[in-house]
Amino acid sequence: MSETKRKSIFGYCMYDWGKSAFETSVTTAILPAWFAALFLEANGLTGTVIGMEMTSDAAWSLAVTLGTLMVAIVSPSIGVIADRKRIKMVALKWMTWLGAGSVSLIALAPVFDISFQWVWIFVMFLLANIGLNAAGVFYNALLPYQGEDHEMDEISNKAYAYGYLGGGLLLVAHLVLLFTTDFALWATQVAIGSSGIWWFGFAWYTFAYVAEPEIENEIENLNIKDATKLGVSEVFNTLSEWRNFKTLFIYMLAYFLFIDGINSVTSLAGAFGIAVLGLTMGELIMTILIIQFVAFPAAFFFTLSLIHI
């Protein structure tokens, strides 16, 4: 393997290492408890969110849903742009700025009045989710350029393993910080803010080592309007031919249900643990840590299994 290719794969994996801090420390372990406490203090058991009465865990679910839905709506357009123009790395940087920047800004919630703190977290968390999901479109589009077809599983699993380890290591540091300060407010702010810095900081390996892929038949001057038309038409053309690819269609449908189920569990597990199971933040963090350090070697095990099958 050439040095350039090795660095490119390393840079690709380091993006997962960085952004997993948001998915573990922020989305699952720390922020749900902080959000629930602020929501309860400001509103009581229920509050009004965009005209609807909601509990804290329902409001949290709404933020996750809106972030995912917004990206899903524009995915055909940005997917076409990613495939037809050499902007994958540029767009990945933009979305990382949005996601990581919004995460760090969550830490500023205490500067506002108590009635607005949970609203600030809701908005910043929504923007962070949009950044994460949109970045995922361009990040995943880079995978086929990191190696040959037979190497895709190995590279993908390696990136997952890096993500579990990176997110787990930062969560250990956050656990030590929070326990030694008796969960002081400033410690919570540092934990949240550092997650955004961790995400963007390690993403620089990706920006430095992963090159913008070449594209055959690049479309010049492709704007959002044209990309939307092209993206929607390609989606409908593909769906109209599903009978010719029944096995692939069933696989895609099954994968859609499977991966959305996984993403829903990981995004809402923290809120569920706090609001329904009554876990403390410390208990929730310990649970997530166990999961992270079981998943890390498991991802490498699957990689080795694929190599020898």
Model-derived regions: residue spans:
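Short amphipathic helix-loop junctions that connect adjacent transmembrane helices
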Residues: 26-56, 267-284
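C-terminal ends and interior cores of transmembrane alpha-helices
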Residues: 96-115
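Juxtamembrane intracellular "pre-TM" segments in multi-pass secondary transporters
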Residues: 2-10, 213-251
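Substrate-agnostic recognition of the 12-TM MFS/MFS-like secondary transporter fold
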Residues: 11-28, 63-80, 87-99, 120-183, ...
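Conserved small/polar residues in nucleotide/adenosyl-binding loops
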Residues: 307-309
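Short helix-capping/hinge motifs at transmembrane helix termini and TM-loop junctions
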Residues: 40, 109-114, 143, 178-182, ...
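Short hydrophobic/alpha-helical segments at membrane-entry points of transmembrane helices
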Residues: 115-124, 250-251
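A single, central transmembrane helix in multi-pass transporters
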Residues: 239-297
